[in-house]
């Protein structure tokens, strides 16, 4: 599958001007008090205002997961564009799939002059804790008109939920990305996310 450049995939170059910070992955969070479990069957939900971009985004993430030896499916193969915004339809699709994990991923807007997080671990809002209602909330927020116009920086965020418990177990954010850079490809950042998930014990190593 052809790699997706940020500028092409998300159409944000005209909206945001920002610098590129070296290094693909910035911060991670792991559920405290619970030993990591390797997830072997995942569903990937990409969040985007454009259905075509969302499907391509999910496909690239799934391809990378399969390349790492993990069974994975794109949400668009289980849900119509209409149903992807309906929480009940999403819950039913996840339940029918038999998947043990769900990844929700999107480009998060950020203002670079905001206070630094102070380390390699980011603070996860309480709303993130449960897949439902988190999914509906983030879908509504990111797809709202003008969402990206309010920010001058982007970070790729990926959140892994245990499908059975519908609970967040791992969250990661990339370093600041430059959507206008021809050198910045979404596949590079996805690969870094998957590598970190594997290193943290949430994906099988073989």
Spans of model-derived segments:
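Short acidic/polar alpha-helix capping motifs at helix-coil junctions
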Residues: 24-27, 53-58, 122
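N-terminal segment of the mature soluble domain
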Residues: 41, 45-118
């Amino acid at each position: 599958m052809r790699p997706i450049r940020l500028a092409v995939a998300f159409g944000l170059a005209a909206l945001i001007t920002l610098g590129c910070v070296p290094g693909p992955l910035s911060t991670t969070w792991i559920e405290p008090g619970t030993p990591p479990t390797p997830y072997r069957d995942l569903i990937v939900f990409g969040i985007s205002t454009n259905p075509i971009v969302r499907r391509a985004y999910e496909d690239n993430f799934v391809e990378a997961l399969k390349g790492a030896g993990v069974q994975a499916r794109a949400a668009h193969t289980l849900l119509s564009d209409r149903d992807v915004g309906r929480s009940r339809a999403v819950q039913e699709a996840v339940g029918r799939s038999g998947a043990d994990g769900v990844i929700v991923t999107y480009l998060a807007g950020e203002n670079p002059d905001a206070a630094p997080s102070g380390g390699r671990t980011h603070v996860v809002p309480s709303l993130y804790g449960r897949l439902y209602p988190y999914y509906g909330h983030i879908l509504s927020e990111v797809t709202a008109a003008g969402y990206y116009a309010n920010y001058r920086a982007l970070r790729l965020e990926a959140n892994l939920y245990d499908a059975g418990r519908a609970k967040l177990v791992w969250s990661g954010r990339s370093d600041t990305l430059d959507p206008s850079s021809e050198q910045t490809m979404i596949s590079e950042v996805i690969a870094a996310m998957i590598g970190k998930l594997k290193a943290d014990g949430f994906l099988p190593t073989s």
